[in-house]
Amino acid sequence: MVVVTHISTSFHQISPSFFHLRLRNPSTTSSSRPKLDGGFALSIRAYIEKPNSFSTFANKVIGSLPVIGLLARIISDEGGVGRDLVDFAEFRKRVGNKCTPDDSRAFYEFQQRRGKAGEPLYVLLCCWVAAVGAGLLKSEEILEGVTRVSISNDLEFEEQNFIALMTEARQRRAKLNIDAPTIPMELRVEKALEGIYACCFRRGLIEEEDEKLLKVMLIAVFPSVEKSEIERIIKEKATRVEEGGEEENVMAKRLPKEAIQMQMKDLEFLQQQNIES
């Protein structure tokens, strides 16, 4: 299998190592990223396991034990037990470890069809924030973030921004003693598809070949969801877009490019203020 070191590759196959790449933007540094205070805890089910499975319960128990939980985090291949957050890098690693050559080829071919906006990292960011943030983030927050990243190409910034928003939402719920709602896996897939459409299609039609590639990619990321259900979700989305039923929703949820750029400047200013204080 070919080891890919850059997104724009001439090979028709993407190895798992592609998904493990750390994100670095030459125009930014780690010092400009928002620093998160301790105390953040989030239950992550996503594509990793079913919400009520025995392994979920066991991981929560193990994670609550100080010494055993620490050892489990060190030796676990997948990393993260109990209520730990699966960050974007870990998410990509897990997806890459489970991807088949056909799965990797689908990511590559999708990029070839959609151009830069269809880069695998963009697709995976949409899947990650849907898997992790559903129930904590508003749909508008997800769509605004994935739309920004298609313009700025700063995935690390958006990851940290999403985490900050989830942290804030989690803390608000903790103060009110309210648990985050349990979001079915099928709805997480729908959220992921909404993000991919906003980021990669820019209100264009979802063609038949796109549907096939989306099905392969979403099954690779969300294997616990029935293939027929994922196919239904994609088909219904494509039909709504073709019939114009999504136009009003897209116009209401997506911000103009200028507004997004202003929003990014505001976020960067607030980050700098936090660092200086």
UniProtKB/Swiss-Prot annotation:
This is Photosystem I assembly factor PSA3, chloroplastic. Its main location: plastid. It is found in: Plastid, Chloroplast; Plastid, Chloroplast thylakoid membrane. GO terms for biological process: photosystem I assembly. PANTHER family: PHOTOSYSTEM I ASSEMBLY FACTOR PSA3, CHLOROPLASTIC. Interacts with PYG7. Disruption phenotype: Seedling lethality when homozygous. Pale green and slow growing phenotype when grown on MS medium supplemented with 2% sucrose. InterPro entries: PSA3. One of its GO terms (cellular component) is nucleus. Nuclear genome-encoded factor required for the accumulation of photosystem I (PSI). Functions as a PSI biogenesis factor. Cooperates with PYG7 to promote the stable assembly of PSI in the thylakoid membrane. May target primarily the PsaC subunit. Does not seem to be required for the expression of chloroplast genes encoding PSI subunits. Keywords: Chloroplast, Membrane, Plastid, Thylakoid, Transit peptide. The gene is PSA3. It is a peripheral membrane protein. Residues 1-45 form a transit peptide. The keyword Cytoplasm does not apply.
